[in-house]
């Protein structure tokens, strides 16, 4: 499963292609990934401008100009390919992956096509309105200022689980995994 470093690498690759761009076409080639896509997924995203692309733990977050955010979790095998635009980090590939695993397509006003592939379909996407606190239960980022020795001592106090188990708990620290 992609962990924080891999998700951040994906964010950095997508950022120059998506930030500030309008989604001129969105195609959901199936109604679900791990979970059903929102019924208005295509309608809410088509025509939206992506204001910024960020990451929280293992989640990619695309802030939209419609007071909403597109949330993406890559699951185990989710990945993006970019066609029609040069992207740093080698995300723009000449030969696309197996099309049967191409589940969501995004086209931008800059003629880029961003395709989400997920062979095992463990990833998911959702759209939520600004002010929604669905990620509030995540712990601090491991590279953020809140994650320090005092925080760990408090988080581990009176717990019977192993340190590894506690560190993998996304409520304690967001984005860590077992890779």
Q: Which functions belong to the PLM regions below?
A:
Residues 70-175:
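Phosphate/anion-contacting hairpin/loop surfaces
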Residues 22-41, 54, 80, 153-179:
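Basic, nucleic-acid-binding surfaces and adjacent catalytic neighborhoods in DNA/RNA-processing proteins
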């Amino acid at each position: 499963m992609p962990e924080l470093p891999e998700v951040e690498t994906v964010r950095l690759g997508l950022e120059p292609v998506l930030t500030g761009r309008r989604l001129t076409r969105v195609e959901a080639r199936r109604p679900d990934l791990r979970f059903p896509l929102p019924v208005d997924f295509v309608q809410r995203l088509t025509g939206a401008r992506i204001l910024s692309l960020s990451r929280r733990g293992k989640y990619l977050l695309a802030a939209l100009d419609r007071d909403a955010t597109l949330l993406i979790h890559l699951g185990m095998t989710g990945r993006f390919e970019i066609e029609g635009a040069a992207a740093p980090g080698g995300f723009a590939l000449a030969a696309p992956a197996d099309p049967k695993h191409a589940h969501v397509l995004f086209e931008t006003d800059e003629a880029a096509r961003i395709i989400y592939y997920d062979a095992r379909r463990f990833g998911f996407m959702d759209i939520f309105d600004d002010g929604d606190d669905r990620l509030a239960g995540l712990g601090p980022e491991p590279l953020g200022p809140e994650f320090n020795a005092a925080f760990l001592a408090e988080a581990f106090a009176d717990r019977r689980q192993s340190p590894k188990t506690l560190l993998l708990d996304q409520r304690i620290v967001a984005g860590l995994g077992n890779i």
